[in-house]
């Protein structure tokens, strides 16, 4: 009987540890919608038509949208920006600096050095990313994304 209780205790402890390991922060559709709304407000202030892609921690598209007058290439560009930011956990602007030191990084499929890709973080943990394309420069795309992220920062805790 003691052996049974001992084994049962170990089983319960291991299940508790296992369930804790499965709990991960991730970007939800609700957060993605709030972020997209803020991005569109910022894009309107900048008088640019953009496309945006928001990825979750696993690289799945949570939300993508293209404004009516955004150029045709902006959706694919936004996707690459989001993928790059998620893959490396840094902005695409920072990735461009890294590529200067390690040019072979450009061989990684679906990455880009164009500004406008930003990791979405909860504390120090990357829980997703956003890619924005359509402004005359990647710096403006990134400015739009950072402003929007700062306005929803309370949702990322």
Segments and roles (model prediction):
Residues 5-16:
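Bacterial N-terminal signal peptides
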Residues 19-157:
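Flexible, solvent-exposed loop/hinge segments and secondary-structure transition points
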